[in-house]
């Protein structure tokens, strides 16, 4: 996964998302705008993916003095469709700013704002192909159960892996850290605290703090979307 343009796994999902969205927008004669908080990896990957794209722009918000991985060349190559905004504050200040913008539907819809993080299904689905690729590399070298160990993060990788499993990929499970929102009972079944509240009765998805717990609920039929 590090054999990508910027050397990070995010390139896989972001390149697919940007290319697909650019094609759709071109066919419809429309434009769209990414609004994301980034201090490095996401911004660098998005800047590379947007090179030469005519129908998509990106606003990257970051705390002053923290951004890495972006250079002047990124903006030259992109012909003016990357807009970096430096905020004199913390990463949480940046998140609050973006959250307040996405809360305003009257602004979001006419400007066709979207996100490049894994709340966007177009970014998440390509990650499902990580696991068949890994399986193709190890299937003849392993003669026992195959279990993937993953960092928790926002659970995007385990959701993508479970999608691959639902697509009939033969594997035996995932090992991920638990916390108060996601644990397991004595039988190993997932316990998702949020599942006691129907999805339609919850607050809107937080654009600043992406969580894929609702997708996990749907996979395990804890709370149908």
PLM region descriptions:
Residues 1-225:
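PLP-dependent amino-acid enzyme catalytic core
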């Amino acid at each position: 996964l590090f054999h990508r343009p910027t050397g990070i796994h995010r390139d896989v999902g972001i390149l697919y998302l940007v290319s697909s969205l650019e094609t759709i927008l071109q066919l419809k004669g429309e434009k769209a705008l990414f609004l994301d908080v980034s201090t490095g990896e996401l911004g660098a990957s998005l800047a590379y993916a947007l090179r030469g794209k005519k129908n998509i722009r990106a606003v990257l918000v970051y705390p002053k003095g923290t951004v890495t991985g972006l250079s002047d060349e990124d903006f030259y190559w992109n012909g003016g469709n990357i807009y970096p905004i430096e905020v004199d504050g913390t990463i949480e200040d940046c998140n609050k700013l973006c959250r307040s913008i996405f809360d305003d539907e009257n602004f979001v819809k006419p400007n066709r704002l979207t996100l490049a993080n894994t709340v966007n299904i177009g970014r998440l689905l390509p990650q499902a192909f990580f696991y068949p690729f890994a399986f193709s590399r190890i299937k003849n070298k392993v003669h026992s159960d195959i279990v993937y160990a993953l960092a928790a993060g926002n659970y995007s990788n385990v959701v993508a892996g479970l999608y691959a499993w639902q697509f009939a990929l033969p594997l035996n499970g995932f090992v991920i850290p638990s916390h108060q929102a996601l644990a397991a009972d004595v039988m190993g079944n997932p316990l998702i605290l949020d599942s006691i509240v129907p999805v339609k009765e919850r607050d809107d998805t937080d654009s600043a703090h992406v969580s894929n717990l609702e997708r996990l609920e749907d996979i395990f039929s804890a709370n149908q979307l």
